[in-house]
Amino acid sequence: MSKKLFSIIFYSCVILVCILFLPSLIMPKNITIFGGKLLGHWSRFCLKFFLSTDIIVKGKENILNNENFFIACTHQSAFETFYLQTIFNSPVFILKKELLQIPIFGWYLKKIGSISINRNKVSKDNLGFFEDIFKTINSNNSPLIIFPQGTRVLPDERPSFKKGAARIYQELNIACQPVAIDSGYVWPKNCLLYTSPSPRDRTRSRMPSSA
């Protein structure tokens, strides 16, 4: 019952926030960003209240400050797309182009400056990708979040990493902040929730820029 309540109440609130924040699409971006942070804190509250699940964050002292960097994060559930917005300051997501085409949800992703890449096209068709990243980093002073696995995976899956994160690291010469998350044990992809140990967000020491 608690799992069903979680799903019903959490996603009902997500829909409500998306509707209430529609005016933010024509307002300053900070308003939309606040809505994302609100859902991040809401996800933590719901996990604790309905599933007695704590979020344990280790390594916050390793978070980079006062320099350009991007975040390479493992991807197991929808949880990290909400909660990482409460840890990092106004992050910008690098994501597959299809997500921007989702009504309402895609509008918000565009508003916060998300950068899309068409994974179905060869590299030469994505030449503007690194230019967009470079402009975003220099104009917004916001960290970028990329999921190198390319999609959500189960905790025991070990898919090969995509080349995007490595190319950003090499081409733009900026530091990388690795983040490991095990949220899939509690909030797995394409499944109903089930009770399990607390999700742990491990923020690891950075990889220095390649300079």
Role assignments for model-derived ranges:
Residues 207-211:
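Hydrophobic alpha-helical segments, chiefly the membrane-spanning helices
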Residues 114-136:
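A membrane-cytosol interface segment of integral membrane proteins
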Residues 21-26, 65-122:
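Catalytic core of membrane glycerolipid acyltransferases/transacylases, capturing the structured
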Residues 1-56, 107-108:
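A transmembrane-helix-recognition feature enriched in membrane-embedded lipid enzymes
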Residues 133, 149-157:
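Soluble extracytoplasmic domains of inner/organellar membrane proteins
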Residues 68-70, 141-147:
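Residue-level preference for the first positions of well-ordered beta-strands
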Residues 96, 149, 181-182:
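Cofactor-binding loop segments of dinucleotide-utilizing enzymes, especially the Rossmann-like FAD-
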Residues 106, 143, 154-206:
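A cross-family acyltransferase "interaction/gating" segment
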